[in-house]
């Protein structure tokens, strides 16, 4: 299994269990997820080490809640955040500088294609700004990558967009 981590915050963003494809000329990765529902807080009586009490009233056990969301977000503990268009422009400008710095250290041949492609991709993001929900890694580092969540034309299938050069891969 391959875990994709944020190059700056080192937060886990997603893994290779999802359908992943390169978009924007290889600049970004599009990761397709699905909506899932999970029950949390429900504890099986057998795990407590006994049977339901014959003396107590019925249904007094543990409470459970059902949480529905996108599997990528839930599995990797991504945190939703929000941006105005102006705030996102400021964030993305600083983020691009950070990634450019990392690339200059680690992969200098990627600097020019990244900066050229990123400018185009950012124009596309800003043109479709209202369609996106924004997610950051579990540690909520404001300097880290902000992943974009959108839905396919069917309105049901979620997908997330990540800048490929802002990720590091870790084999497990």
Swiss-Prot record:
Q: Where in the cell is it found?
A: Cytoplasm
Q: Which domain of life is it from?
A: Eukaryota
Q: Which UniProt keywords apply?
A: Calcium, Cytoplasm, Phosphoprotein
SUPFAM superfamilies recorded: Mss4-like (SSF51316)
GO molecular-function term, one example from the UniProt record: calcium ion binding
The family database entries (PROSITE patterns) matched by this protein are listed as: TCTP_1, TCTP_2, TCTP_3
User: Does the entry feature the keyword Endoplasmic reticulum, yes or no?
Assistant: no
Q: Where is this region: Required for reduction of TSC22D1 protein stability?
A: 70-172
Q: What are the record's GO terms for cellular component? A: cytoplasm; spindle pole
Residues in domain TCTP?
Answer: 1-172
Q: Where, if anywhere, are coiled coils annotated?
A: none
Positions of modified residues (Phosphoserine): 46, 53, 64
Instruction: Reply yes or no: does the keyword Calcium apply.
Output: yes
Q: What does this protein do?
A: Involved in calcium binding and microtubule stabilization. Acts as a negative regulator of TSC22D1-mediated apoptosis, via interaction with and destabilization of TSC22D1 protein.
Q: What protein family does this chain belong to?
A: Belongs to the TCTP family.
Quaternary structure and partners: Homodimer. Interacts with STEAP3. Interacts with TSC22D1; interaction results in the destabilization of TSC22D1 protein.
Q: Which PANTHER family match?
A: TRANSLATIONALLY CONTROLLED TUMOR PROTEIN-RELATED, TRANSLATIONALLY-CONTROLLED TUMOR PROTEIN
Q: What is this protein called?
A: Translationally-controlled tumor protein
- Organism of origin is Oryctolagus cuniculus
């Amino acid at each position: 299994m391959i875990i994709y981590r944020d190059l700056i915050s080192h937060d886990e963003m997603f893994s290779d269990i999802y359908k992943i494809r390169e978009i924007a000329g290889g600049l970004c990765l599009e990761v397709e997820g699905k909506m899932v529902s999970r029950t949390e807080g429900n504890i099986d009586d057998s795990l407590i080490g006994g049977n339901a009490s014959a003396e107590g009233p019925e249904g007094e056990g543990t409470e459970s809640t059902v949480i529905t969301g996108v599997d990528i977000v839930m599995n990797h503990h991504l945190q939703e955040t929000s941006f105005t268009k102006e705030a996102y422009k400021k964030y993305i400008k600083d983020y691009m500088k950070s990634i450019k710095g990392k690339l200059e250290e680690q992969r200098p041949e990627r600097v020019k294609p990244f900066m050229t492609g990123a400018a185009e991709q950012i124009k596309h993001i800003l043109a479709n700004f209202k369609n996106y929900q924004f997610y950051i890694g579990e540690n909520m580092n404001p300097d880290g990558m902000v992943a974009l969540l959108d839905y396919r034309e069917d309105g049901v299938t979620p997908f997330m967009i990540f800048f490929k050069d802002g990720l590091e891969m870790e084999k497990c």
